């Protein structure tokens, strides 16, 4: 009996890890990966950090260059897909080639959510999703240049830190009343706001751009009435999933390809993962997790589901952010206002804990990354704590 052919569409973390997971889980059939980028699949997190700060930055490949040939995975780089071929099971490229598939994994990521007012600036306005974006930003983030960043989420703050370290004059504009409002708890939001302000970043909350004039410098008029002059304008206000191919194939979409918890779409032969996917939970709600670890997890889940194997157990959600000399790691549930703090954030060493009825459900570490491993185990096991003991620095965490 002829083994099935699996095609992976995408060139990022989820795509590469799906290939690795399929081989690790025993798939020996024909395996192809199609990507519109000419690079081997590379890590995205360094784009806003080391790719802007190091003297001679290099893309960090998800898998070693020799892995692909050694594992008999056929790479098709720099190609554009015309149709997924849901009915014919034939992937069609814009160059006319067609490729048969029995199962398909879509991991084509997302684009920056557009902001037409700034997009009209053309090459003077920047977003950050790919290696080419980072290379262009690196060229323009020069000392003493005025940089305006729209959006104070994770990417916006990481870019603010990198631009400041490149000795730019940075202003951040945020519509909300706080920074990192979607994915950090209140005490961490306050810490980050103060950290950036101390570094010289001007952060304008509860504000937005109303009018833009392109001249020798870009003139930005804000809702508050203030006018800013900028040499460089960057924005990061969320993502827009690259779902067009899926829509054209009549797959369910909702700013993302709708999948179940096995990463399966409405077509049982088609799976999706990473930023392009959005999960319909058991209660009907739609949930997207935009993180490096989620891309890895969904790649492993999809591979297992494709092969009819038991699905791996998911660890608590985890992501990290590097800003200035700080490493922050977020794990578990970030909701809620009653967080405990172990240590003193002013010394740039602390851990915030989220206890619910004594059960640890979430935590954020500040330059204490070594503690993430035990914290992960505690969250997974539903361990209960005495709050006073948890924040007592005289008691080693590992002894609790």
Curated annotation (Swiss-Prot):
User: One Pfam family for this entry, by name?
Assistant: Pyr_redox_2
Catalytic activity, reaction form = 2 reduced [2Fe-2S]-[ferredoxin] + NAD(+) + H(+) = 2 oxidized [2Fe-2S]-[ferredoxin] + NADH
Which cofactor is recorded for it? FAD
Q: Where does FAD bind?
A: 5-36
What is a biological process (GO) this protein takes part in? 3-phenylpropionate catabolic process
Q: Which pathway does the protein contribute to?
A: Aromatic compound metabolism; 3-phenylpropanoate degradation
Its keywords, alphabetically, are: Aromatic hydrocarbons catabolism, FAD, Flavoprotein, NAD, Oxidoreductase
Q: Which cysteines are joined by disulfide bonds?
A: none
Q: Which GO terms describe its molecular function?
A: 3-phenylpropionate dioxygenase activity; ferredoxin-NAD+ reductase activity; oxidoreductase activity, acting on NAD(P)H
Family membership, please give it.
Belongs to the bacterial ring-hydroxylating dioxygenase ferredoxin reductase family.
Q: Which PANTHER family match?
A: APOPTOSIS-INDUCING FACTOR 1, RIESKE DOMAIN-CONTAINING PROTEIN-RELATED
Complex and partners: This dioxygenase system consists of four proteins: the two subunits of the hydroxylase component (HcaE and HcaF), a ferredoxin (HcaC) and a ferredoxin reductase (HcaD).
The protein's name in its UniProt record:
3-phenylpropionate/cinnamic acid dioxygenase ferredoxin--NAD(+) reductase component
Question: Which species is this record about?
Answer: Shigella sonnei (strain Ss046)
């Amino acid at each position: 009996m002829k083994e099935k052919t699996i095609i992976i569409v995408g060139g990022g973390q989820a795509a590469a890890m799906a290939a690795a997971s399929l081989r690790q889980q025993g798939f020996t059939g024909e395996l192809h990966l199609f990507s519109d980028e000419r690079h081997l699949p590379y890590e995205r997190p360094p784009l806003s950090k080391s790719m802007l700060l190091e003297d001679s930055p290099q893309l960090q490949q998800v898998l070693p260059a020799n892995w692909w040939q050694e594992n008999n995975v056929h790479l098709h780089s720099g190609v554009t897909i015309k149709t997924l071929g849901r009915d014919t099971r034939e992937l069609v490229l814009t160059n006319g080639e067609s490729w048969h598939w029995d199962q398909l994994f879509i991991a084509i990521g997302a684009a920056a959510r557009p902001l037409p007012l700034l997009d009209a600036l053309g090459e003077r306005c920047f977003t950050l999703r790919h290696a080419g974006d980072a290379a262009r930003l690196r060229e323009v983030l020069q000392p003493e240049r005025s940089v305006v960043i729209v959006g104070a989420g994770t990417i916006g703050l990481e870019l603010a830190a990198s631009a400041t370290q490149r000795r730019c004059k940075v202003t951040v504009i945020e519509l909300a009343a706080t920074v990192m409002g979607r994915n950090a708890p209140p005490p961490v939001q306050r810490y980050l706001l103060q950290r950036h302000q101390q570094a010289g970043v001007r952060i304008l909350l509860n504000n937005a751009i109303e009018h833009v004039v392109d001249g020798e410098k870009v003139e930005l008029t804000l809702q508050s009435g203030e006018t800013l002059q900028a040499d460089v304008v960057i924005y990061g206000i969320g993502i827009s999933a690259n779902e067009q191919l899926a829509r054209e194939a009549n797959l369910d979409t909702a700013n993302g390809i709708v999948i179940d918890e096995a990463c399966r779409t409405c077509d049982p032969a088609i799976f999706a993962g990473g930023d392009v996917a959005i999960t319909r939970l058991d209660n009907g709600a739609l949930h997207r997790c935009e993180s490096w670890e989620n891309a890895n997890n969904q790649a492993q889940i999809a591979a297992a589901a494709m092969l009819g194997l038991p699905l791996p157990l998911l660890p608590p959600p985890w992501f990290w952010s590097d800003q200035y000399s700080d490493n922050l790691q977020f794990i578990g549930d970030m909701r809620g206002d009653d967080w405990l703090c172990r240590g003193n954030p002013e010394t740039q060493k602390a851990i915030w804990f989220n206890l619910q009825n004594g059960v640890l459900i979430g935590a954020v570490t500040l330059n204490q990354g070594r503690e993430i491993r035990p914290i992960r185990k505690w969250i997974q096991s539903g361990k209960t704590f005495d709050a006073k003991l948890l924040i007592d620095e005289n008691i080693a965490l590992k002894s609790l």
